[in-house]
Amino acid sequence: RADTQTYQPYNKDWIKEKIYVLLRRQAQQAGK
């Protein structure tokens, strides 16, 4: 599975995870 993710770095799950982390960072900054 690692090879698949490396071959297709822009997976739906990958994008979801990136967006999720991004939103969490923004939420934390806004909370502070």
Curated annotation (Swiss-Prot):
SUPFAM superfamilies: ERH-like. One of its GO terms (molecular function) is methyl-CpG binding. It is found in: Nucleus. It holds the Pfam family ER. Keywords: Antibiotic, Antimicrobial, Cell cycle, Nucleus. GO terms for cellular component: methylosome; nucleus. GO terms for biological process: defense response to bacterium. Belongs to the E(R) family. May have a role in the cell cycle. Homodimer. Component of the methylosome, a 20S complex containing at least CLNS1A/pICln, PRMT5/SKB1, WDR77/MEP50, PRMT1 and ERH. Interacts with CHTOP. This is Enhancer of rudimentary homolog.
